[in-house]
Structure formats: structure tokens, C-alpha cells
Amino acid sequence: MRRLRRSDFAESRWGGPWLALPALLVGATGLRLVGVRYGLPFPLLNPDERNIVPRAWAMTHGSGADPGWFDYPTLVMYVLAPFQSWHDEPSYLTARIVVIALGAAGIAAAWWLVWKAYGMLAGFVAAATTAIATTHVAYSRMAVTDVPLTLGATVALALMVVGRIELAGIAVGLATSAKYPGVILLAPLVAAAWGKWRRFAIAGALALVAFAATSPYVILRFGDAAGDAARVQRSARDGWLGFENDNAAPIAFVERLWDGLGPVLVVAAIGLVLALVHRTRADLVLAVFCLVYFAQLMTIEAHFDRYVLPLIPALGALAGRLRSVAPVTILLLAVPLTWSVRDTRDLTKTDTRIAAHRWIVENVPKGARIAVDPSTPDLTGYRVVHLLLPRPGEPFDPNRDVDRLRGEGIRFLVLTGAVEDRVLAAREHYPRETDFVQEARRGGDRVYRVLPDGRFGGPWVEVLRL
């Protein structure tokens, strides 16, 4: 562990190191709070919110601690559940605020990790990188598992760096209980405990205990959980709508990292090379984590930006390692900050799907039969047919047939660019789905359309009368 030197305080020049962190946390939290109400009362920021928040709410309203669903472990649901107890229905806003708090804790954890490894100024660089990275900013507003996983990973890495191997094992278990890829933290744990195999064995046992204590039904219903986890992994490996024409996985995920970090990624790459050359304990822990985590992404064809999120604090640490260029790195953070502010500004608008929902409620009689694309607001009081999301390798949804819909008495169809733009961009992979959109537009009357503009954010939405 690198000892803190008096010179580190002089290097900061930010009004004192203990003032810089609170100021950074206040600014980062403020940035994340803007747009936190986007799409409410519907989970339009991320469809996974619909899988997590209602289950957390149900846990404090009589359903018990078993979620009955294991695409993710249960720690995040358990964390959210107490804050749902006073609500009469699932509160996406409350859940998002809890995740914002976890995101702020992750920024502080990045500071702590790098302060212990490379000094105070490097810690500020890592914390600022985490605070500003577009991916971290965006997912801190979403009541999903990615920011909690990143927090757990950062705390685990920090404990490894300072040699608290057993406590690091507990943190590994908690990170894995937030999201299954946390198990990859066992690789840097091996590096941190190299030659101390008894301590590693204890840490591994503590990791299992921490996981079992916070996701007990994954253990108790292991068959169901293993099946759900394997299905999620297969889906990620097979790809997802929108990534059909992407670059190969190594290039695609570097692009996702660039989208989050901008030119700071170059500084982090140089820091990674230096870490591999010098190989201090901190260097090895960070380098092993980054390399092993990135390597496992190579098997994935669904190139979601959230998959690189746990790398952000570690890459910020490696960028901060180059203390001699820290002022330049801080200036380079202006690029992702500009991107984050731009994205945040869009979240101050009304989502187009909310506007379409209001139009339907005001103009379509209750009880009417409506077919809708995924990721659209609930239409209470209507008889709704939910169209399935087209995906690589999945069978064609028979409801994506205009004649069939008409034959079943469905008179309205809601299409959204969040789905159909991706279908049309990969029409060679989805010829029948493309024909469905074109036939619906030819044979139906467009009674409402809303586009993203100065008033509205989100995808275009069309309501067609069949």
C-alpha cells in the first residue's frame, strides 16, 4: 500500500483534499438528479426497472423474500425493498434515488481505492472520471443492477489494494449478489492474495457466505436460478436487437468505453501498460481485473454500454496513476462531461411515449383492443396485445401480422422507433418484421404521431388505426 505523503495535499490545489471530494459528490449527485423523473410514472428509462422495482415493492407488501425470478441475484431488490414499504404501488422514483445514492458512494469508493494505491491527486482523477463518465451518470438514474455492481467491485478492489483480503472476499460476494458478473472479481483477489492461500481460501468462503446471505433463494432454488442465469447469458452471447451490424466484440466494447470516457480512455490505456510493467500490488489488482473482465466480454454479441460500467472506476484509477499528467487528464474530462450534460438535457423533456399515452387515453375508447410495441407505458382499461421484441435466433412473433391483428378485433397499433428503427436498420435479419411495419403503414391510418423535438425526448411514436 502506498503511504499518504504530505506532498499529496499540496499537489491537489482544489481547496484541500477533504473539500474536493464533497464538492465532487455534490456536483455529481446534482447532475444525476436532473432527469430522475424522466418517463414517470412508467419505467421508460430502462425496461429492466419493470423487472426489479415491482418485485422489491412486493417484498414489503406480503409476497415474501423470494422474488421467484433469478435473471439477477436479489441483493439489489433487498436494498430497494425497505424504501418501497410506504408506497401503495411500486415507486420508480424512490428506487432511482436509492441508486443515485449508491452511485455517489461508488464515486467515493473510487477516490478511496486510488488514494490508497497512488495518492490523493490520483484519487481525485479516478473519482472525477467516475462522476463524469456518461455511462455511470446515465445508469445512476436507473433502478437496475449495474451501478450497485460497480460500487461493489470498486470497494472490493480497494480492499484488495490495502491487503484486507478477507474483507475483500465479503465485498466480492456482495458484488456478485448485485449482479452475477461480480464473480470475476475472484481473479484480482487471486492476484492480491498470491502466496497467501490460506487467506485466499478464507476470503473465498466469506464471499460465498456473503452471496448466500444476500441472495439466499439463488442457493435454495439453485436449479431455477441456474436456468435463468444461463438463459440470460445465452441471450447476451447470441446478441440483441440493434447490434446485428456492430463491429466485433473487442472493437465494439472499446467504442462503448470511448463513449463513456472519451480521450481519458487513452490515458487509462497508458496507465494499464505502466501497471503491467511496474507490477505493484495495486497495479496487479487493477490490471488483472481490467484484463479478465474485458476478456469475458469477448464472448458477448449484445454490446450494451452497461456491460463496461464496472471497468470505469478501475480505468479512472489507471488514468490517475499518471500523476504527472493529472492536470491534462482533468481537462480531458471536459469531453465526457459535455456528453453527460447533453444527455441529461434531453431527460428534462417529456418522453414521446408519455405524449402518445395521453393521446390514447383521451381519444381511444376504454376497452378497445390495442397492439403495442415493447417499452411503452401500460394502458390500463384497454385490452392490450404486447408485441414481442424481435431478437436474433428467436422465432417470429405471430402477432406481427396485420391480417391476424384485424382478425382478432385489434383496431389500433402503437409502434415506436425504440424498436422499429432497430428492426429497419437490420432488415436483412428481420424481413418478416420489416414487412409488418411497412404493411401496417400502408394499410392503416396514422391517427397520431409524435417526434422527438424541442418539447419531447425519446423515440418517435405512431398510433395506427388498422
What are these regions (language model features)?
Residues R5, F9, L159-L167, I184-L208, ...:
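Perimembrane helix-loop-helix junctions
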Residues A138-P148, F304-D305:
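Short acidic/glycine- and proline-prone juxtamembrane loop motifs at membrane-interface regions
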Residues L25-L31, A126-A131, T154, A158, ...:
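Short helix- or helix-capping micro-motifs
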Residues A105, A109, T129, P148-A171, ...:
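Specific aromatic-rich, kink-prone transmembrane helix
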Residues V26, E89, L93-Y118, V155:
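Transmembrane-helix motifs of polytopic, lipid-linked glycan transferases
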Residues L21-P22, G204-V209, A317-R342:
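Signature aromatic-anchored transmembrane alpha helix within multi-pass, membrane-resident enzymes
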Residues V34, N51-R55, Y72, Y78, ...:
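Transmembrane-lumen/periplasm boundary regions of multi-pass, lipid-linked membrane glycan transferases
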